[in-house]
């Protein structure tokens, strides 16, 4: 009997409960590979700290057979809400301002609300399917619905989503670690030395920190970093709101090659400095002194981007500092995938549901409502104030945009350090379920092997590093993963599983019709987004110098 399957068994209290030390003797029918994964993940860890380190392995409490949906869980309502919020929150928040800049405020808010509501409906379908299908494992639901192809489809979608998350975390290291080192060394600009090269740094961090942590058998203690990760994102949003009222508009025209302020001789300019509550730091920039158009001047965009800045600064235009409410361009295609990437939490919904104390579908739906609503508010604040800080000059990774304005800033340095520590410690947690799924799929019922344990981790990390080094910007990760695996996990798979496994509702019932419409909507979103992204790649090929 599968230890995590929902079966109709005797629901008398389970007196001979298996302890962690006797897992192997209690489950002799379980493959050695699976036992090794479970023993390594959950030894000496309580249910609160286990959280959701893997997709499907639910902790030592869940190693007993679940009698039915009302088998008592161990995790409180509040902790479950916190866990799901942390599962939703991720690096996607850093790309939302870029999405708003390429959709406009009104269109972005409509799309954000739409994706949030659809995510809630998707969770509803998933919870109902789990009950009717009799499983709390995403891949197992796929197998029950469509056999081996369904299992592989769910496996590929979850693996791609986790690889996308890993790559986005490594991108943040590549973007932000050089800035942190530059500030600590007191350099005005990135001089191009090897220790300021993001490609080298991400390799060093991967080999020196991430790989050793990924080789540990027990990663349970890293689950506590999820709380730190969520806290640092709250701090990040607070700093974004605060900095909105410090950054002027138009943006400063800075020559990053010479480290000096430059200006157009035809426009009256003057130098000012904004303090950042630090004695030795500040923000220098040039602004139009008169804030009016000099007579006889025909303002045109500056000739090309400033070298090394990654941002094209234009001469002051009338609407440069006016927010746009509706925007359509080639980059608008990235908006829905970025939003989908930001709201994916579905592989973690079932493990969290299984551990919810006195659980019911209604209670878990309430947990989902609270978590997604909370993240919706944070996403909206981060996107809005990040966009209003830079308008059309916002970058696809918001933190990196601030380095174009601030040379040294204590608050931003603290945010960068917090985010770097959080994402570095999160990568092994994301890697662990990928490795477990690969071992289970390729080496079923094989004994634990350190060679496989090390080799698969090294291959996954190496592939992610190659991806991060070769792909010029994080928006391509957000876009491609959001349009493919995120759309599969939010829209297509839950609806398809529901239509196939929930037998008691007729096909023409409102519930089934709604699920069918949801499925078709997901397919349209995926095909449309992928087509537009590919068109953007063709007509606006990636710039290898962008970083």
Swiss-Prot record:
Tissue expression pattern: Expressed predominantly in liver, and at lower level in skeletal muscle.
Organism (species): Rattus norvegicus (Rat)
Role according to the record: Symporter that cotransports neutral amino acids and sodium ions from the extraccellular to the intracellular side of the cell membrane. The transport is electrogenic, pH dependent and partially tolerates substitution of Na(+) by Li(+). Preferentially transports smaller amino acids, such as glycine, L-alanine, L-serine, L-asparagine and L-threonine, followed by L-cysteine, L-histidine, L-proline and L-glutamine and L-methionine.
Name of the protein: Sodium-coupled neutral amino acid transporter 4
Pfam family, one: Aa_trans
Name of the gene this protein is made from: Slc38a4
SS bonds (residue pairs): 249-321
Cellular component aspect of the GO annotation: microvillus membrane; plasma membrane
Stretches in topological domain Extracellular: 1-104, 173-195, 242-332, 391-411, 475-476, 536-547
Gene Ontology terms: biological process: amino acid transmembrane transport; L-alanine import across plasma membrane; L-alanine transmembrane transport; L-arginine transmembrane transport; neutral amino acid transport
InterPro entries tied to this protein: AA_transpt_TM
Glycosylation sites: 260, 264, 276
Influences on amino acid transport capacity (site feature) positions: 232
PANTHER family per record: AMINO ACID TRANSPORTER, SODIUM-COUPLED NEUTRAL AMINO ACID TRANSPORTER 4
Entry's localization field: Cell membrane; Cell projection, Microvillus membrane
